[in-house]
């Protein structure tokens, strides 16, 4: 048996328009899965300004699995708390060290550096970004979502004005907020534009602002944020009440100092302005992420307030979700309906992020004295509770989002807390293998060291450690040889806390947990759930006879 849908595999490349973090993540992922790609960007050179700054825990986990984490950690500056000030005093802290991840902080790193790390990875994978190349027209070849049919015809124009007509299997719009593809398809980018103007800058400062915390100040006319990038280099963002009318002039150091002094009670001296700009917040999103063979991700699909540092992370995770599914369908290893789950899963996350960042922005930017008095009185109470700390750190870090409502997620009788659609927690475990004599041998590992981001991993969790996997199991799963990795795990020895976390997650009995390539769970069941699992596999990834 082999896995695949006969005569349904593709040959044409996937065209990615836009080479920011979203587009480069798509290129990296699709290439890893053996899908030919073209990635174009109309800019001749990469941007050198920092723009997005925060890399969240969930993104760091995904980057670790793809070999990018060491360079990120070498350059980035971790922030372990977010301190909120108002009325000249500290109102409370969000304790980021409570994030349920190995990366229990926000890593502050210039977007230009994040893009450099992704570009270097593309070079290692043999991918060249076609810069100075713009897609000027496109059309869908056929109104069909069936694999092996249809496609997208695109017209590209390079920096010399040379035109090229390209047929692609799929098109990914990662062009940013002014997506030509979105406009051409007349898709509604629903939401609102905030009236406030903001000053944004990278600069250095002297004073008592911590190097390992996000410092956020509330004021009657808006808010001020000062975020450490390391070595006294900071990102500065503030509501600029005097610039509500559209203006193209960049704020000066003197203007930034004035904004700081008006909003903060902590004396500092700003210096050495690296760059600055003004902007307004748009809070908008598409309500569909797919038009047949065309997919949207990142700012082409959603833009929102920078509150919480979610934007770039959301775009990267859009492509982590889409790419493995697109690759499976491209290779003929999955039913075409798998692609519908991209929109199912990511739209729910996007709606939540847009809603929550908009609420926070409206509150902090309110010109109502009453609202700011409420913040000053309520924030200390809320931030002192463990529940609010858990909720806030889970959402900020993006480790709390799940795909439980997805049609791809199936839970079948479980005893632990994990459900299909959840992110796999990175626990310390014992792994079990059989030696040449059939005897079980164990080793110790982290779950994220075990799972394979290029295929599914079936974890057989718990049960008797000396019991080998049943030959019947292996026989029933044989149609998916090479498609999924089978691994027995038990709690790590001599670690009481690790056993508590293991039992809380998987239950005290034996369970079957199928981990997707993006480390979310596709199927969760107890030890008798193998028939339900094979039915699930047949539904989405049916094998066929040679």
PLM-predicted stretches and their roles:
Residues 2-391:
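Core Rossmann-like FAD-binding/catalytic domain of the broad FAD-dependent monooxygenase superfamily
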Residues 2-17, 32-33, 89, 101, ...:
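Helical substrate-recognition/capping region of FAD-dependent monooxygenase/halogenase enzymes
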């Amino acid at each position: 048996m082999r896995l695949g849908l006969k005569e349904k595999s593709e040959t044409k490349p996937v065209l990615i328009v836009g080479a920011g973090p979203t587009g480069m993540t798509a290129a990296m992922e699709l290439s890893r899965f053996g899908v030919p790609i073209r990635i174009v960007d109309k800019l001749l050179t990469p941007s050198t300004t920092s723009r997005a700054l925060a890399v969240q825990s969930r993104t760091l986990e995904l980057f670790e699995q793809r070999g990018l984490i060491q360079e990120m950690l070498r350059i980035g500056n971790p922030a372990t708390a977010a301190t909120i000030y108002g009325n000249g005093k500290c109102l409370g802290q969000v304790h980021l060290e409570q994030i349920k991840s190995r990366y229990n902080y926000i890593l502050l790193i210039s977007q230009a550096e994040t893009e450099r790390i992704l570009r270097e990875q593309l070079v290692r994978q043999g991918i060249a970004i076609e810069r100075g190349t713009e897609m000027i027209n496109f059309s869908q070849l056929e109104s069909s979502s069936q694999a092996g049919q249809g496609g997208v015809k695109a017209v590209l124009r390079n920096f010399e004005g040379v035109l090229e007509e390209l047929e692609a299997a799929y098109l990914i719009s990662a062009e940013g907020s002014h997506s030509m593809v979105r406009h051409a398809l007349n898709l509604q980018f629903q939401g609102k534009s905030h009236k406030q103007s903001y000053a944004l800058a990278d600069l250095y400062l002297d004073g008592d602002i911590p190097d390992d915390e996000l410092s956020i100040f509330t004021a009657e006319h808006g808010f001020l944020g000062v975020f450490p990038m390391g070595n006294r280099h900071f990102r500065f963002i503030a509501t600029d009440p005097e610039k509500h009318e559209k203006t193209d002039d960049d704020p000066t150091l003197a203007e930034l100092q004035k904004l700081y002094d008006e909003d903060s009670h902590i004396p500092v001296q700003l210096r050495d302005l690296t760059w600055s700009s003004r902007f307004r917040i748009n809070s908008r999103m598409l309500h569909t992420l797919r038009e047949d063979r065309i997919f949207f991700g990142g700012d082409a699909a959603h833009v929102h307030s920078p509150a919480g540092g979610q934007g770039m992370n959301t775009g990267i995770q859009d492509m982590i979700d889409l790419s493995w599914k697109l690759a499976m369908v491209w290779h003929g290893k999955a039913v075409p309906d798998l692609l519908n789950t991209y929109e199912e899963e990511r739209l729910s996350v996007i709606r939540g992020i847009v809603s929550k960042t908009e609420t926070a922005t409206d509150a902090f930017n309110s010109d109502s004295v009453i609202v700011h008095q409420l913040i000053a009185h309520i924030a200390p109470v809320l931030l002192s509770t463990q529940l609010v700390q858990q909720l806030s750190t889970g959402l900020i870090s993006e480790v709390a989002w799940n795909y439980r409502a997805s049609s791809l997620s199936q839970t079948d009788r479980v005893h632990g807390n994990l459900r299909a659609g959840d992110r796999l927690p990175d626990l310390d475990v014992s792994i079990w293998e059989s030696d040449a004599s059939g005897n079980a041998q164990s080793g110790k590992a982290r779950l994220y060291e075990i799972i394979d981001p290029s295929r599914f991993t079936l974890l057989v969790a718990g049960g008797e450690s000396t019991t080998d996997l049943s030959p019947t199991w292996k026989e029933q799963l044989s149609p998916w040889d090479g498609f999924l990795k089978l691994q027995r795990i038990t709690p790590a020895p001599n670690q009481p806390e690790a056993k508590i976390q293991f039992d809380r997650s998987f239950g005290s009995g034996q369970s079957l947990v199928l981990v997707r390539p993006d480390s979310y769970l596709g199927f969760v069941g107890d030890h008798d759930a193998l028939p339900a699992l094979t039915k699930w596999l047949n539904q989405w990834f049916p094998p066929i006879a040679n």
